Design a protein with these regions (language model features):
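Bacterial N-terminal signal peptides that target proteins for export
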Residues: 1-9
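Non-catalytic C-terminal interaction segments of nucleic acid-processing enzymes
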Residues: 27-31, 49, 76, 133-166
């Protein structure tokens, strides 16, 4: 009888341990990029936080290709600015602009104007994604995406001031 009890106890122990294994792997929540209109608001606010005044957007010409680039927000008193690159923009511009940076890489800059002295930071929409409470858990919030965008704008403004860009 003792042997039977030990065997049954071991069986119960192993069965319960197997039941406590990791749960099913779940797919990541679907995400979407920050809307361009909202991104421009965030960019304008970030410029203000750096003590500068946001200026109206404008069209510029990329050096070497002659393709037009839309600067979504300029900085008053300076020629540099910020372009929020949507998937559609990236498709239209193709090889005229550098490929999207990964989150751990430096921001991409484009040279514009006749001599290429003017710098425009390219902020790719796909780098600012959120999950909008879809799925089981909220992993990437809108607030987080907006903070990352704001940080990138502020980093560029600091870089532009340090380098004394036009």
């Amino acid at each position: 009888m003792g042997r039977f009890v030990k065997s049954a106890a071991l069986f119960v122990l192993f069965a319960s341990a197997a039941a406590c294994g990791p749960g099913e792997a779940r797919a990541p929540n679907p995400t979407r990029p920050l809307d361009e209109r909202r991104a421009i608001e965030v960019i304008r606010k970030a410029i203000s936080l750096e003590g500068e005044k946001p200026a109206a957007g404008r069209e510029v010409t990329l050096v070497g290709t002659g393709k037009p680039l839309r600067v979504d927000v300029g900085v008053e008193g300076h020629e540099y600015g910020i372009a929020y690159i949507t998937a559609e923009d990236a498709s239209k511009l193709g090889d005229a602009i550098p490929p999207k940076n990964n989150p751990d890489e430096k921001l991409r800059l484009a040279r514009v104007g006749e001599t290429g002295e003017i710098r425009i930071v390219l902020l790719y929409q796909d780098n600012y994604r959120y999950d909008d409470l879809i799925g089981e858990g909220h992993e990437q919030t809108t607030i987080t995406a907006e903070r990352v965008l704001s940080r990138d704008v502020q980093d560029f403004i600091t870089h532009a001031k340090t380098r004394k860009l036009k």
